[in-house]
Amino acid sequence: CAESMWTSAKALFSNAWDAIVKAYRKFCQWVDKYIGTFARLKMKIESLEKDAKKMDGMKIKSGEKKLEITSGNKNLAKPAITSAEVTYITTGRGLIAEVADLRKENATVIEMQRSQEDAVTKFSDALSGANFGDHADAVKSYDDLHTATSGILKKFKDKAGTNQMSAHDTTHAKAYSVAVLPGYQRVLFMLPESIDTKPQATDGAMDAMYDKFNAVDMKVVDGDPELKKTIKETIQFEAMSPSDIEELANELKKGVDDIIQYRSSKQYLKNEAAVRRLKETLEKTDTRRVNTSDDDASKYTRAAGKAAVAMARATMRMLSVPTKMVTFYDSYANFCIGIGRKSMSAYETR
């Protein structure tokens, strides 16, 4: 009877705690939507748009048509998709087009995250039930994990494409240029060969998979370190017209609205919960693996456990891609607002 009461009490506490966490996450979501980073960014953009509308009929000052950009000048430099060549954004139309491209990239990676919830949950279930106690269990557990992660890996490989950048290759992974960003940044997906091929059930094969999964990553790097040293210290940027400033603000606002809409959705909370569960399961699995005594583990079971943990960590890194892109959009939007304000200062005041 006492044991039954204790079990009921634990279940009641667990349910209450889950409800508290859910309510807290909804509160954080509300804060993020109305007074968070992107809500404040949207207010700055709307202020820029409002001020641009007041400039109708204003004339540019004599000799002020060209702005000298010395601070944050690299944000006007962009590498080619498959080479180290650099192009400069020097007009308002070019800047507007760049923001539109960034919105498309954000939409792509957000959709990648949006569609991963079931796959992440499936992978978490397989990881939670993994048993690396003996050879047979370890083989089955790794096979289950391999199957569970196949969908995530396929999306990552499909997004990687074929634009290889061998200069950025590492010992265990090839670099694929998936996007270029202003600021002379390049988005690289690091993928080993045969990452989705099921390995043989040997400790050597598991060690190789451990190295491969550790190499899986998404990096935002300088397009070319040597060329970056030669980027112009001062870039001549054509002062934007009031209509271009207004259009820039409108394009920036669309991107922010896309982000706010997603981050305030139920799907975002579900995805976040799935990733959080994966992280907790990963930590428990790794602790269980580390604490397994040498007497209970063979070379294979230990190697398979390490490979499984590396697989889970690689999955976590892949799932962080949208966050990195959204963070970049925030910083670049602030730079664009600065360019808009600098252009306004080139006009005569009434």
Which ranges hold each PLM region?
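Low-complexity, intrinsically disordered, cysteine-poor segments enriched in small/polar
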Residues: 4-8, 12-15, 19-26, 30-33, ...
